[in-house]
């Protein structure tokens, strides 16, 4: 007799939610639709998550854990300022591209009409990433003896706005316009401009 692996129902619910966000762009996901997709009753959903907001929080926790842990690895492994910035931006874009449904959460599109604390959490995540970029840029002076002519906070904001814009285009195009398209060429241009400042 074959033993089937035990399904982690909580993870399965989150995977179905992410899949529905991808396959139903621009549409609101109801708990009734999600329960049908998962193959359980709405009551069964609520045994694992007390509310739909908690389901979205589960996705946001996955996003935070995935991105912030990888950014820490970049910080440990790479010492060059420009390479660090490139890798952080590339991480954001590749993560969004590989997780189209979740990119709607990053973009805020899937959170319209949902609990305000969800949008606040995504805003806080982007604030942490911007702070990390600012720190990377500030360390250039310490590591290389030369900083930038423009304030690092302004530059960090510009870099993050670039990544957020690419993610917004991806969501708006219903996942046709990949965030990483032309990234290498765009990064070379951005890097050249940063080094000139």
Curated annotation (Swiss-Prot):
Gene Ontology CC annotations of this record: bacterial nucleoid; cytoplasm
GO molecular function, one term: sequence-specific DNA binding
Residue intervals of the HTH tetR-type domain: 7-67
Keywords assigned by UniProt, alphabetized: Cell cycle, Cell division, Coiled coil, Cytoplasm, DNA-binding
Coiled-coil residue spans: 109-136
Location within or outside the cell: Cytoplasm, Nucleoid
Chief subcellular location: cytoplasm
Gene3D superfamilies: Tetracycline Repressor, domain 2 (1.10.357.10)
Pfam family, one: TetR_N
GO biological processes: cell division; negative regulation of division septum assembly
Residue ranges of the annotated DNA-binding region, renumbered to this chain: 30-49
Source superkingdom: Bacteria
Assembly notes: Homodimer. Interacts with FtsZ.
Role description: Required for nucleoid occlusion (NO) phenomenon, which prevents Z-ring formation and cell division over the nucleoid. Acts as a DNA-associated cell division inhibitor that binds simultaneously chromosomal DNA and FtsZ, and disrupts the assembly of FtsZ polymers. SlmA-DNA-binding sequences (SBS) are dispersed on non-Ter regions of the chromosome, preventing FtsZ polymerization at these regions.
Family to which the UniProt record says this protein belongs: Belongs to the nucleoid occlusion factor SlmA family.
Designated name of the protein: Nucleoid occlusion factor SlmA
Source taxonomy: Bacteria, Pseudomonadati, Pseudomonadota, Gammaproteobacteria, Alteromonadales
